[in-house]
Amino acid sequence: SINKELAGGNMSVYPVPTKALTPAPKGYQPFYLSHYARHGSRYRTEEIEYKNPLETMKKAKENGVLTADGEKIFDLLNQVYEYAKGHAGDLTMVGALQHRGIGHRMYDNFPEIFGKEIEVDARSTTVIRSILSKVNECMELQSLNSKLHFYNDASPHDMYYMNNNNPLLNQILADPKLELSKIFTGTYLESTTTPDRLMKVLFNNQDYVRWVVNAKSKIGRAVQQECRDR
């Protein structure tokens, strides 16, 4: 069957892993675990990414160019905007559950480590969504074994390796002569975006789309992404 959730592209929620782990070699057992993760599912990083699509659709509604499906999407965008207001970049409830799931799988898969009294060193960047991701993971482990001792920290001291910013790498990725740079500068997206079908679903006047919505603009792409996210 087709998983429609994958239409969200890199905004799709990570699937819960179901594959069996490779057992340890005979005569060996786990004694230490080092885990490095990204934060869980988050809201869009800028509130304007919710506001701009809504304003575009609101203007289209005022001009009477929304289709019946466009009206439905407009209503959904209103709901999404109200729910997401003030949450730009925050960890979502899904994101919190993802990290609780990671903590639970750690406990289930490595009882030799987490089934006894040990110390857990848990660190994150200073970004709120990362801190809360870490905390949810630790809370899940704590609920499964009250004998675990946690050291939690979120400090600029550790940012150099957790969220490293390499100026030379950024310069290389921004080089227009490199094919790879197209992905990071947005030109690849511009060249591969074909929104005509979606625009016909949302709007009943394609001249309006071309001259007002500008489907290949940042706002137009945001409308498409919000539609996929729903």
What are these regions (language model features)?
Residues 1-119, 127-230:
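Signature for phosphate-centric chemistry
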